[in-house]
Amino acid sequence: MFAPLGLFRDIPCPQREECSLIACLFSHRDLNSAPAAQDQVLEQKEPAKLPPKRLKLEPRPEAKETPKDDLRHVSDSGRSTPVKKTTAPATNAENISPVSRQPNIPKNTATAPIKRELNANTGSSIPPRRAPKEALNPRMIQKSPATYNVRMAILKKLHGTLCSLNDQLAKDKALEDKCLILTPDELITMALDEEEKVAKESPTVYSNVVKLRIVKLSRMSKEDWAKELKDYLNKKYYKIKAEPVQKEPKPFKTDLSVEEEIAVASQLITPLQGLEDFGYVTRVPTAEEIEIAKRGVAEAKGWEKCERCNARFQVFPGRREDGTLTSGGTCTYHPGKSFYPPRKKTDHITGTMREGYFTCCNQKLGESSGCTTGATHVYKVSETKRLASILQFEKTPENPDLHNPTPICFDCEMGYTTLGMELIRLTAVSWPEGKKVLDVLVRPLGEVLDLNSRFSGVFPEHYTNALPYSTAPTKSSAPSSSSPSQLQLVSSPAAARTLLFNLLTPSTPLIGHAIDNDLNACRIIHPTVIDTAILYPHPGGGLPYRMSLRTLAKKHLDREIQTGGASGKQGHDSVEDALATGDLVRVKAGLVWGRLKEKGWIVEEGRLVAPDSSSNTVSMQTKLGEGAGAKRAREGTS
């Protein structure tokens, strides 16, 4: 239609390699010259394809463009290695060709060495930044919030403010992270990103938002600018996921005194009678039951079902002749639980299919056999008589030497061995103060298959660095999250159980979450327990469904716990879990005491005293009732 004037043919294309136009108005000459120059240099580096006489003819006219310093190096190298007329060594061709092609290198590649140098000074393994070369020109969007002149004026002001902050960092000699100093291209890109973001997100108040942003940047300190710049660079270039920051839990406070909390705890005791079907052990297995369990294990010849992938495999306690502990090879499984998204009433209208997925990898159920591979298969023993065949249960003995014992919160960590899932760490803290009174590593009875470090937080190096347990009394410490590498090691689960018995009497409240698992791991039968899994029943009807400790801590304490288990790098911390369990009981104790106080109850000498007229009535109201599911089942059958 019209003859092109070529007014933009000398201007580099702003889109560079990403330009998709067939006949672009801008120049792409610099983009194509660099690869061509590199190809020519590579071609000259191949001595087999070069005729011997070309070495004399071609370098001379191009040597005029070479700087004097470079010519001096070339001449010196020529004197050290004389060139014969008949042959041309390949080394001389390599020395001359880069010098002759140096003027053809595009100018826009001069910023690359700067970025590499800045990143190298940090000493980190972050990838190099590759900012596109853009003009300081507002980016085109579908609906512009202002005229071009207004956007251009604001963009220049924003760019100038960013340059000023960047110059302050560049002049700071004490700056350790030199990679925070931006190149001119990166400053332009950052200004364009800031302006474009406001133009898209706040078009109606575009001018005010950008001006406030410029004022905030101009008043920002170097420390705040460096922090904000790190977040921007990570999102823009590095895309490195930040490790979860574990915050120190805030101490939980109530309006009750320690004496009042301990007194109210007597109203929160969980009766275990009738809960045997849910894993709670209330009596010691007999010798006949243990013998039956041993015969069953002998007849099975070591064949078990994998706890993770449900595969059948054979386990060899004490090792097989060739040193093998298990058969079946490696185990491929999903460490996370399966999750089904809640359905909506409009799903049948919209046709939405909500399929279940695994929380560890977000894969749909049935897509793969697993996302994690374990060295061996593992299994867990849940039958009471078989647990007793490995280590017999014991009831909490009387302890006449222990006067006025305080309630104890305890938590156990378990790992997989050739005998099933065994105790590997035991932690106990006082309640309600939360002082640590016992925290030891435990050497299991069987050979270790998997320490279950993703959840237990115990790694092999913790056993390597552990010291034998000392009977010397240890000072109670403030609530803290100790590393297992600092713990002492006891010889067996029975030894750990004895240490816990030294802190208890049969009437001492023992507090835990899903306490049946911890009691069974220690082989303890304790008559006075407070289980937060029953204290806070599941909305689905109570047992066998249970709310996780992490969910309860977030809901009632506004506390994030067990954050190390997501990545598998740290795992859970039994001290953290024990403290959270104790604080959940304190929350419930405060609610119960509020109702008791309204009824006229008081605390005298560490005991609850009921009013004379309605002591029995109020006492029954404060005790825990049966779950909602049991109530509905009873009402439906009657």
UniProtKB/Swiss-Prot annotation:
Gene Ontology CC: one annotated term: nucleus
Biased composition (Basic and acidic residues): 55-76
The Exonuclease domain, residue ranges: 408-584
SUPFAM superfamilies in alphabetical order: Ribonuclease H-like (SSF53098)
UniProt KW keywords: Cytoplasm, Exonuclease, Hydrolase, Nuclease, Nucleus, rRNA processing
SMART domains xrefs: EXOIII (SM00479)
Aminoacyl-tRNA synthetase as UniProt keyword: no
Biased composition (Polar residues): 77-111, 612-622
Enzyme class: hydrolase
Region annotation (Disordered) ranges: 37-136, 612-638
Domain of life according to the entry: Eukaryota
Location within or outside the cell: Cytoplasm; Nucleus
Keyword DNA-binding: no
GO MF entry, a single one: exonuclease activity
GO BP, sorted A to Z: rRNA 3'-end processing
EC number(s) on file: 3.1.-.-
Function: 3' to 5' exoribonuclease required for proper 3' end maturation of MRP RNA and of the U5L snRNA.
Family in the record: Belongs to the REXO1/REXO3 family.
Name the UniProt record assigns to this protein: RNA exonuclease 3
UniProt organism field: Emericella nidulans (strain FGSC A4 / ATCC 38163 / CBS 112.46 / NRRL 194 / M139) (Aspergillus nidulans)
Gene field: rex3
